[in-house]
Amino acid sequence: MYTVDNYDVIVIGGGHAGCEAALAAARMGHRTLMATISLDNIALMPCNPAVGGPGKSHLVYELDALGGQMGINADATAIQMRMLNMGKGPAVHSLRCQSDKIKYQHLMKQTIENTENLNVKQIMVTELKVEDGKVTGIVTELGEFYGAKAVILCTGTYLKGKILIGEIDYVGGPNGQRVAEHFSQSLLDNGIELMRFKTGTPARVDKRTLNLENMEVQEGDTHHHSFSFMDEWINRNEDVCWLTYTNKETHEIITSNIHRAPMYSGKIEGVGPRYCPSIEDKVVRFADKERHQLFVEPEGTSTNEMYVQGMSTSLPMDVQYAFLRTIPGLENVEIMRPAYAIEYDCLNPTQLTPALQVKHIEGLYSAGQANGTSGYEEAAAQGLMAGINAALWLEGKEPFILARSEAYIGVLIDDLVTKGTNEPYRMMTSRSEYRLLLRQDNADMRLTEKGREIGLVKDDRWAKFTAKKAAIDEAMDMLRNTPVNPSKETQALLESLGTAPIRTGIHAYDLVKRNELSYAIVADAFGLKRYTPDVEEAVDISITYEGYIKKQMDQVDKVRKLEEKILPKEWDYTEIKGISLEAQQKLNKIRPHSIGQASRISGVSPADVSVLLIQLEQYNRSK
């Protein structure tokens, strides 16, 4: 075995988790190696050519506020942007961008290759080296050894990946890539528990063979949007998508061939994603539905490949052609890449600490689909946190852990390490108890200061953040201190604004509270200073939802007390009398960081928590 080099951090994988992990560790000053199966597929988007959407966009905004890369990349390579859920409250507003996937890859590769302290190599890792419970490095298929103080697993869907299309299956990764066939065994040999999951992707079709006039045009917003708080608000609406639907004939073809689908024939062992079902799943599970919605989306500005969103399948090619050609707009479609299902190994995430470190192997971290999640955004968020925590661990500092009340990233990681998952985990706004506090628009106000303390928020971002914060404070003070008296002129002005008259003197702040008014309307009417749209939006939301926000903050204060009660790492819960056998087993397996985390474990009752509180109090008194 030939020793090539030694690094502070080695990141295994060059997907969305790997990119953020490697960038974070390197930017925090640690010599880092990214080991990827293919240099040509760094930050590959093997499924939908898009970033964001409900719940997912919140992760991207948070990642950006902490100093991550995905938001900047998504903005720079977007070809269409839409703000979803605008008919609902601001807690669930979600930005989604259609990406030029090729440009996205190229820009991320360029960023990786030009980051100080970061090397990237095309390497197939076959073995993880561990000595005395501590990671020491990796071995490649060519017999090379790379030493490392910390290793981050970002293996995606490449561990023993298997492609399934109808009756055919073969070893392979997304887009026909190689897979890591032997690395799973090395993880097992080191006591790491693996699961088998499955996901899938639709066919890519040739735009030249589509009848676009038979589909509805789906345009982007004309409003200014961006994921990154560093970005200028510019219009990104270069391309359109198309909307179409399946029909009775489509469903009949799928139903009559359902026995040829690997999921139904028994060929697939892995568990698939609940919230991204295949078309055959949808047809079977929702047999009463006459049609299912599809979006036909461009994969970029320099290709004719189109992504058929909503048509993930693993049916054979002849069936794929047959049912696609029953759909309006796809009557003459030609498939450029087939739809397929992919099975892969991943870690049981309950083996991880909230810092994403494997509990029984010092210096080993894991992030992304390797932890049982689905989606680029979930992967990137975990990658950033794993990279940060590996760097902090090397520096002898406390881990960086976000609470559920602080970020969707905190919700994501807490769900994984506390509850685990038996299917690919997808982030949704409904998973958070504090949705109104964790909006995408205020991610910078919540997290930029934390990113600054860590060292990922540089001076330019910090200057922008402090200027915005000062502007919000200034606007709020101005509204609170601007009197509005019930004069005839004022009453006439209010009537012209379509709002009720006032009986006594109030302040401009009280007017902004009214549903039909906003900061912009009040400012123009009363000659107040105007601000940038993001500042005015923050002011509007803070004032309109003031009462609800206060209620959630009170809830957070109550929960925080339990989160601050840290449990000793050395406790053997089987020796604690008064808690149930199930609680003892679950607590010993998950080894929660705090009383708060323990209270969220399935099988740990309020009575068990009460016993733990008493035991912890006695333990702390005896120290």
Label each region the model flagged.
Residues 379-400:
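Internal hydrophobic alpha-helix adjacent to the cofactor/substrate pocket in enzyme cavities
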Residues 307-373, 401-414, 532-586, 591:
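A glycine-rich dinucleotide-binding beta-alpha-beta segment and adjacent secondary-structure elements
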Residues 38-40, 83, 185-321, 418-491, ...:
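An anion/pyrophosphate-binding glycine-rich loop and adjacent beta-alpha core
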Residues 3-17:
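Beta1/beta-strand and adjacent pyrophosphate-binding region of the FAD-binding site
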Residues 12, 145-156:
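Short hydrophobic core segments
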